[in-house]
C-alpha cells in the first residue's frame, strides 16, 4: 500500500522526555497518516516504548506536542485526555494484559463500558467482534484457557472495540511462534483494509517490520533514519 499524501492523522512535534538526568527522547518528530502502518525499530533502551507511552498519553513529554486529528493533547485536562485516548487510541502489548478473572468476551467489553455503553450493548459488540476474529467459540473462555495467539487476538479486539483511529502496538508478536505471528500480522493488515486503522508498531522482528509502509530507526532517543518497512535495519 502506498503511503497516503493527505493531512497527517497524527503529528509528533519535537518531543523530549527525561527520567531524572537520563534523557530518553531527544527531539522526536514524526507523522502518521490514515491507513498507514509505521514501524519503530532500534536497540533496547533506544526509547521506543517511552515514545509509544507519550504518543498514547500514558505519559507526558517534558517538551513538545502530540496532535491527533487536529487536537493538541497537551491542551486537554486529565479527564478529557483519558476520554480522548479511549475514543481514538487502542493499545496492544507483547504481554496481552488480559484480566484473568474475566472471560474473553468480558475483557473485550470492558473498554466499551468505560466509554459509557451499557453492559448489554458492550457485551453484544464484544461478541460480534470476537466472532469476526474467529474467536466465536472462545467467548466464555478465561485467558488461562486460551492459546498465546488467541490471547493476542482478544487483546486486539479489546484495543479496537471503541473504533479508534490509531492502534499502538509494543512488540505485539514478541511472545508468539512463527505461525501465530503470521496470523496476527495478517489480522493487522486486514483491519487496516477493512477498518481504515493506522498502526504504530514497535518491534525487533524483521517479519513484523516488513508489513509496515515505513520504518523509523530510533537510536539514543533520536530518529536517525527512515526506510521502507521491508528495508528496516533489523
Where are the regions a protein language model picked out?
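ABC-family P-loop ATPase nucleotide-binding domain
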Residues: 1-16, 225-234
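ABC family nucleotide-binding domain
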Residues: 8-220
Amino acid at each position: 500500500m502506498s503511503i497516503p499524501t493527505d493531512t497527517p492523522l497524527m503529528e509528533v512535534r519535537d518531543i523530549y522526555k527525561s527520567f531524572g538526568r537520563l534523557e530518553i527522547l531527544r527531539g522526536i518528530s514524526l507523522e502518521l497518516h490514515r491507513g498507514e502502518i509505521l514501524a519503530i525499530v532500534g536497540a533496547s533502551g533506544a526509547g521506543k516504548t517511552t515514545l509509544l507511552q507519550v504518543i498514547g498519553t500514558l505519559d507526558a513529554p517534558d517538551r513538545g506536542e502530540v496532535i491527533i486529528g487536529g487536537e493538541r493533547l497537551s491542551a486537554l485536562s486529565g479527564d478529557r485526555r483519558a476520554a480522548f485516548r479511549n475514543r481514538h487510541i487502542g493499545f496492544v502489548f507483547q504481554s496481552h494484559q488480559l484480566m484473568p478473572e474475566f472471560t474473553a468476551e468480558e475483557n473485550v467489553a470492558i473498554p466499551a463500558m468505560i466509554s459509557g455503553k451499557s453492559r448489554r450493548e458492550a457485551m453484544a459488540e464484544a461478541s460480534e467482534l470476537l466472532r469476526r476474529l474467529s474467536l466465536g467459540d472462545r467467548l466464555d473462555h478465561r485467558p488461562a484457557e486460551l492459546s498465546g495467539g488467541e490471547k493476542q487476538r482478544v487483546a486486539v479486539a479489546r484495543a479496537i472495540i471503541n473504533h479508534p483511529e490509531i492502534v499502538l502496538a509494543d512488540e505485539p508478536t514478541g511472545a508468539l511462534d512463527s505461525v501465530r505471528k503470521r496470523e496476527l500480522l495478517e489480522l493487522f493488515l486486514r483491519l487496516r483494509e477493512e477498518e481504515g486503522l493506522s498502526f504504530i508498531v514497535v518491534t525487533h522482528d524483521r517479519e513484523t517490520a516488513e508489513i509496515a509502509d515505513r520504518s523509523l530507526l530510533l537510536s539514543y532517543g533520536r530518529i536517525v533514519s527512515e526506510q521502507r518497512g521491508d528495508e528496516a535495519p533489523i
